[in-house]
């Protein structure tokens, strides 16, 4: 039975999703959960792209102990050197180098001839091989590349020392039949095919990312690249949870095994959904809210008699456990810590102390503390502790003629208090206009989403906003509070703080 490696690029390609920007603490938290999930390789970022991304890759490389960490690099010596520096503390470092091979990319983006591309691949793969034991090469836009030239580029990379060849469907152009044939062609033409790990990197523009990834596995790929929940640029990437469960459920067909701990998918999905601000669609395969719901009477009757009639995946398989022990105001610190670890959170002693204090306050205010409340509690603590600004006071009042006024007081990181007031056509607009004055910013609100974390009158509100600055960069903010207006203010303030620090990495050419 063949072994399939899982390569997660949530922290690199997933973060290219408009409005998604993880800070260092969030990235480490995600990486630790991916390690617990059993991911073989974590792509931590693009070290050369910005000082912030370099520090993130460096921190993740130091934190991860049981899987490989890799960084992205162009065919540029400076990129490779920077990646080496960022990954020097990794237990098992790898590097991921890319260069486009399609005619449209070579002519209009790279402005390089085929000969120049081949020479660059040869030189830079050889250069990287002197620094890394595992070197992955990706011919960007492979599925739109001339087949003969693609094979020549791949052979050049292997001859120069590449140990992994990744085939990206950069724009989601291919289909399972064509993609499978591409791997068959590589198997036939590349003399070292069985000695090299071949991988797929698929995008979902035509809705076939998972199917294409599985077609690659059927035809010789031994590594699959993707993200949790399928997040990523445009329509997203291959959803790793779908591939992993498909390989498990249809082991009879694929004859493959993995290192994935399937019951960690729900925790992984929840964590990334909340930190990215991207809700999982209810009809999403494997981990969606309706994945195990049955509306039809005939289906319900069948499931009650025997779940196998209509369920091929049990909820418990992917970690959907509706019978978990509830926590309440009488729960102790040990029980709280255990639940946090089960949910994928690895808290320091001080973080645990602060979180438990907030939990006790929450338990006093609510009849029942649900798992969603606990996710929100940690998320709120993480976002607030990472901000340079803290909401200290909010007052909203009716002015005249339907106009609302807002007074907002903010504490800066050094403790300085700043306060201002403004009006708007509604309470939210008044609050946001006031924050704009305080932050001296000119930004556009592009998305505002509010949801109740749980049912009931004592539910907390969770607000997600996306703002766009004058350069076009987008930033995501989260706010959680029992009061909707306070949650809205916290979310907008957090997004504004991110735009001030420019936490979104620079816009670089990437394997998409």
Swiss-Prot record:
Alphabetized InterPro entries for the sequence: 2-IPM_HCS-like, 2-isopropylmalate_synth_dimer, AIPM/Hcit_synth_CS, Aldolase_TIM, LeuA/HCS_post-cat, LeuA_allosteric_dom_sf, LeuA_bact_synth, PYR_CT
Keywords: Amino-acid biosynthesis, Branched-chain amino acid biosynthesis, Cytoplasm, Leucine biosynthesis, Manganese, Metal-binding, Transferase
GO process annotations (BP): L-leucine biosynthetic process
Record region (Regulatory domain): 390-512
Cellular component terms (Gene Ontology): cytoplasm
Required cofactor(s): Mn(2+)
UniProt-annotated location(s): Cytoplasm
Catalytic activity: 3-methyl-2-oxobutanoate + acetyl-CoA + H2O = (2S)-2-isopropylmalate + CoA + H(+)
Record-linked HAMAP family: LeuA_type1
Function: Catalyzes the condensation of the acetyl group of acetyl-CoA with 3-methyl-2-oxobutanoate (2-ketoisovalerate) to form 3-carboxy-3-hydroxy-4-methylpentanoate (2-isopropylmalate).
Protein name, as recorded: 2-isopropylmalate synthase
Species this chain originates from: Listeria monocytogenes serotype 4a (strain HCC23)
């Amino acid at each position: 039975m063949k072994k399939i490696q899982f390569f997660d690029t949530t922290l690199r390609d997933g973060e290219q999703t408009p409005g998604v920007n993880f800070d260092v603490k969030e990235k480490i938290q995600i990486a630790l959960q991916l390690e617990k999930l059993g991911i073989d390789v974590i792509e931590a970022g693009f070290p050369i792209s910005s000082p912030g991304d370099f520090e993130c890759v460096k921190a993740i490389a130091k934190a991860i102990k049981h899987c490989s960490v890799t960084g992205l690099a162009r065919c540029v010596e400076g990129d490779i050197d920077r990646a080496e520096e960022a990954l020097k503390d990794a237990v098992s470092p790898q590097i991921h180098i890319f260069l486009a091979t399609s005619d449209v990319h070579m002519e209009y983006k790279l402005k390089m001839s085929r000969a120049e591309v081949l020479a660059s691949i040869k030189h830079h793969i050889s250069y990287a091989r002197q620094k890394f034991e595992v070197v992955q090469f990706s011919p960007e836009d492979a599925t739109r590349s001339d087949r003969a030239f693609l094979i020549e580029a791949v052979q050049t990379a292997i001859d120069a020392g590449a140990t992994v060849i990744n085939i990206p469907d950069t724009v989601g152009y291919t289909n399972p039949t064509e993609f499978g044939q591409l791997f068959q062609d590589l198997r036939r033409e590349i003399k070292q095919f069985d000695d090299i790990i071949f991988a797929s990197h698929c995008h979902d523009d035509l809705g076939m990312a998972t199917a294409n990834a599985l077609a690659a596995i059927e035809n010789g790929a031994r590594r699959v690249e993707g993200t949790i929940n399928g997040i990523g640029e445009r329509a997203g990437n291959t959803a790793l949870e779908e591939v992993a469960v498909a390989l498990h459920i249809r082991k009879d067909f694929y004859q493959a095994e993995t290192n994935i701990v399937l019951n960690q998918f729900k925790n992984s999905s929840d964590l990334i959904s909340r930190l990215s601000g991207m809700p999982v669609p209810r009809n999403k395969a494997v981990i969606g809210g309706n994945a195990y719901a049955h509306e039809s009477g005939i289906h319900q009757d069948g499931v009650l008699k025997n779940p196998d009639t209509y369920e091929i995946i049990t909820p418990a398989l992917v970690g959907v456990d509706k019978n978990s022990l509830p926590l309440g105001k009488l729960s102790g610190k040990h029980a709280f810590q255990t639940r946090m670890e089960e949910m994928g959170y690895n808290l320091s002693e001080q973080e645990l102390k602060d979180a438990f204090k907030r939990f006790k306050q929450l338990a006093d205010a609510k009849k029942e503390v649900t798992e969603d409340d606990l996710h929100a509690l940690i998320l709120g603590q993480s976002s607030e502790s990472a901000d340079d600004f803290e909401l200290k006071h909010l007052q909203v009042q009716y002015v005249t003629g339907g106009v609302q006024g807002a007074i907002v007081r903010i504490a800066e990181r050094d403790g300085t208090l700043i306060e201002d007031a403004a009006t708007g056509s509604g309470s939210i607009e008044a609050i946001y206009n006031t924050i704009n004055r305080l932050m001296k910013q000119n930004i556009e609100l592009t998305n505002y989403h509010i949801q109740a974390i749980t049912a009931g009158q004592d539910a907390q509100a969770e607000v997600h906003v996306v703002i766009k600055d004058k350069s076009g960069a987008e930033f995501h903010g989260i706010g959680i509070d029992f009061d909707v207006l306070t949650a809205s203010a916290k979310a907008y303030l957090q997004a504004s703080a991110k735009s001030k620090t420019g936490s979104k990495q620079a816009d670089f050419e990437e394997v998409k």
